[in-house]
C-alpha cells in the first residue's frame, strides 16, 4: 500500500516586466500536484476495478463450492469441501476490502488536499489581482495628478498668450487708427501747401505786373505819387510772398516729419503683425498639447478598469471541476 503526502506552498507574488504579477512557482507546483492527483485517481480506479473482478471471481468460486456441497449432500456422499480454500478466499477478500477502504480514505484525503490547493491558488490569484488593482489605481492617480499639473500649467500659459495676443491686437488697432490719422494729416498738409503754392504764384504774378507798371511810370516820368503807391504795394506783396514761402517751408518740414512717423508706425505695425502670428501659433500649440493631455488623462483613468477586468475572475475560479492549471490558463488569456 502506497501513502501519498502532498505539500502545497503558495508564494506571495511575483512581477513581470509589463507590470502583471503571477505566482509562477506556485502555478508550477499546483500543475505538478494536479497531474499527480490525476494519475493517482487513474491508478485507484484500475485497482478498484481489479479488486471488483477478483471479488466477483471469489464469489463465483464460493457459489460453485456451495453448489458442489449441496450436490454432495443430495447424493448422500460422505466427502466434504476443503475449508482451507474458503479461509484463503475469505482472508483475501478481507484484505482486499481493507486495501480498498484505505485507498478510499487516501482518495478522500487527496480530494481534500486538491480542493485546498484550488482554494489556496484562487486566494493567491485574488490577492495578486487586488495588488494589481491597487498598483494600477496608484499609478493612475499619480499620472492623473501629473497630467493635471501640466494641464494647469498649459492653461496658465495659454491664458497668458491669449492676453498678450489680445493686447497686441489692441495695439494693432491703435496703430491702425494712428496711421489713418497721420494719413489724414498728410493729405491736409498737402492740400494746404498746394493752396499756398497757388497763392504764392498769384502774388508773384501780381508783383510782376506791378513792377512792369512801375517801370512804365518811371520811364514816362509821370505822377510820382502813383509810383510811390506802386512801390508800397509791391513791398507788401513781397512780404506776403516771403511769409508764404516761410509757411510753405514749415509745412514741408511738418509733412516730412509726419511721413517719417507714418513709416515708423508702418514698421511697428509689421512687427505687431509678426508678433500676433507667433502668438497665434503658440496658442494653437498649447491648445493641441492641452487636448493631448486631456486624452492621456482619460486613457489612464479608464486603463486600470480594463486591466483589472482581465486579472480578477474569481467567479470562474470557483466553478466546480476546474483545476488550478485551468485557472491559471484562464487568468493569462
From Swiss-Prot:
Keyword terms: Coiled coil, Cytoplasm, Cytoskeleton
Keyword Coiled coil: yes
One Gene Ontology CC term in the entry: cytoplasm
GO biological-process terms attached to the record: microtubule anchoring at centrosome; protein localization
Chain segments annotated as coiled-coil in the UniProt record: 86-120, 160-302
UniProt entry tagged with the keyword Coiled coil: yes
Source organism superkingdom: Eukaryota
Positions of disulphide bridges: none
Entry-linked Gene3D superfamilies: 1.10.287.1490
Cellular compartment(s): Cytoplasm, Cytoskeleton, Microtubule organizing center, Centrosome, Centriole
Subunit structure: Interacts with CEP170.
Function description: Centriolar protein required for centriole subdistal appendage assembly and microtubule anchoring in interphase cells. Together with CCDC120, cooperate with subdistal appendage components ODF2, NIN and CEP170 for hierarchical subdistal appendage assembly.
Protein name: Coiled-coil domain-containing protein 68
Higher taxonomy: Eukaryota, Metazoa, Chordata, Craniata, Vertebrata
Amino acid at each position: 500500500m502506497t501513502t501519498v503526502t502532498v505539500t502545497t506552498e503558495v508564494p506571495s507574488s511575483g512581477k513581470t516586466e509589463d507590470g502583471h504579477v503571477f505566482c509562477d512557482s506556485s502555478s508550477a507546483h499546483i500543475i505538478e500536484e494536479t497531474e499527480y492527483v490525476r494519475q493517482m485517481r487513474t491508478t485507484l480506479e484500475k485497482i478498484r476495478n481489479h479488486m471488483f473482478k477478483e471479488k466477483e471471481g471469489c464469489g463465483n468460486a464460493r457459489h460453485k463450492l456451495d453448489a458442489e456441497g449441496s450436490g454432495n449432500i443430495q447424493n448422500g456422499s460422505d466427502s466434504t469441501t476443503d475449508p482451507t480454500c474458503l479461509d484463503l478466499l475469505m482472508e483475501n477478500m478481507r484484505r482486499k476490502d481493507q486495501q480498498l477502504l484505505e485507498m478510499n480514505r487516501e482518495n478522500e484525503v487527496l480530494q481534500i488536499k486538491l480542493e485546498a490547493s484550488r482554494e489556496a491558488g484562487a486566494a493567491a490569484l485574488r490577492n495578486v489581482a487586488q495588488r494589481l488593482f491597487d498598483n494600477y489605481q496608484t499609478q493612475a492617480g499619480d499620472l492623473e495628478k501629473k497630467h493635471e499639473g501640466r494641464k494647469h500649467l498649459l492653461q496658465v500659459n495659454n491664458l497668458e498668450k491669449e492676453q498678450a495676443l489680445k493686447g497686441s491686437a489692441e495695439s494693432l488697432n491703435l496703430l491702425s487708427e494712428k496711421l489713418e490719422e497721420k494719413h489724414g494729416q498728410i493729405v491736409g498738409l498737402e492740400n494746404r501747401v498746394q493752396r499756398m503754392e497757388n497763392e504764392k504764384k498769384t502774388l508773384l504774378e501780381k508783383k510782376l505786373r506791378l513792377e512792369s507798371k512801375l517801370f512804365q511810370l518811371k520811364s514816362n516820368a509821370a505822377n510820382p505819387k502813383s509810383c510811390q503807391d506802386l512801390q508800397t504795394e509791391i513791398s507788401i506783396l513781397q512780404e506776403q510772398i516771403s511769409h508764404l514761402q516761410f509757411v510753405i517751408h514749415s509745412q514741408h518740414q511738418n509733412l516730412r516729419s509726419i511721413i517719417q512717423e507714418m513709416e515708423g508706425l508702418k514698421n511697428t505695425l509689421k512687427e505687431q503683425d509678426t508678433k500676433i502670428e507667433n502668438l497665434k501659433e503658440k496658442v494653437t500649440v498649447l491648445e493641441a498639447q492641452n487636448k493631448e493631455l486631456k486624452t492621456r488623462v482619460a486613457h489612464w483613468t479608464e486603463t486600470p478598469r480594463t486591466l483589472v477586468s482581465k486579472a480578477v475572475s474569481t467567479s470562474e475560479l470557483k466553478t466546480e471541476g476546474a483545476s488550478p492549471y485551468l485557472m491559471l490558463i484562464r487568468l493569462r488569456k
